[in-house]
């Protein structure tokens, strides 16, 4: 059943397509009598940044102001999007998991997907989500999650208060360990983070890159930009 008036109808390859005023294009499979995921407009135009990630056969792309759209690459079908907790346009609560629909980062790690927003982060395993836990003190309570790097069972996150680290198996049950300017980072907000295979983590800020060791978890130096860069993206390639 559907709640909106159909304004047009078309049949293609045993799929009925119903055009509606407010709910997009509803699709009904006549072969098995089931409703498919509707085609719904995101309502977003001219997005400045759309992060993408792939886990298995599923392509994810974060659309600011909408959520995380999903496509099954094996079938070509669009899937139910991941949306904000308070924004569930007939999709059901199992995919309304996001703390915000302003998506900053997506990072795939095996079958897991890390989603960073301007008001928290979640780990999605394909069927359920875990919200990132934060501490009680300001220096362990990040709000904005700009980038992720996963290495050695630890998730490193570029946040508005520096580089924060969680155990990848305990993101929802343990407080993060965060490094900021008081620990030697070049600036507060860290917009990019990468980890290499030698136990080093690199956090990019608007004033340079902080060089961090995984054990002990501390800042050991920095690469200074010399001037404000607005952003210092980092990437590790081989050695």
Task: Tell me the role of every PLM-derived stretch.
Residues 29-33, 72-76, 125-128, 167-172, ...:
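Short loop/turn segments that connect beta-strands within beta-propeller blades
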Residues 202, 207-215, 235-239:
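Blade-level signature of beta-propeller repeat domains, shared across WD40, Kelch, NHL, RCC1
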Residues 15-18, 58-61, 112-115, 154-157, ...:
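Conserved beta-propeller blade signature
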Residues 1-12, 38-55, 83-109, 132-151, ...:
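Short coil-to-beta transitions that initiate beta-strands within beta-rich domains
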């Amino acid at each position: 059943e559907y709640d909106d008036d159909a304004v047009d109808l078309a049949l293609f390859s045993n799929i009925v397509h119903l055009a509606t005023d407010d709910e997009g294009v509803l699709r009904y499979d006549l072969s098995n009598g089931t409703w498919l995921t509707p085609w719904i407009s995101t309502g977003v135009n001219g997005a400045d940044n759309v992060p993408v990630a792939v886990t298995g056969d599923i392509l994810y792309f974060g659309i600011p102001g909408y959520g995380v759209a999903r496509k099954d690459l094996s079938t070509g079908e669009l899937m139910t999007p991941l949306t904000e907790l308070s924004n569930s346009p007939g999709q059901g609560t199992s995919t309304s998991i996001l703390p915000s629909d302003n998506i900053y980062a997506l990072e795939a790690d095996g079958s897991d997907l890390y989603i960073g927003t301007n008001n928290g982060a979640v780990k999605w395993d394909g069927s359920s989500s875990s919200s990132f836990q934060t501490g009680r003190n300001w220096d362990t309570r990040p709000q904005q999650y700009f980038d992720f790097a996963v290495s050695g069972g630890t998730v490193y996150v570029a946040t508005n208060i520096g580089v924060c680290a969680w155990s990848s198996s305990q993101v929802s049950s343990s407080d993060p360990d965060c490094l900021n300017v008081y620990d030697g980072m070049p600036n507060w907000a860290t917009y990019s983070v990468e980890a290499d295979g030698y136990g080093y983590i690199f956090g990019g800020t608007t004033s340079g890159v902080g060089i961090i060791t995984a054990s002990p978890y501390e800042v050991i130096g920095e690469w200074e930009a010399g001037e404000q860069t607005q952003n210092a993206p980092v990437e590790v390639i081989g050695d």
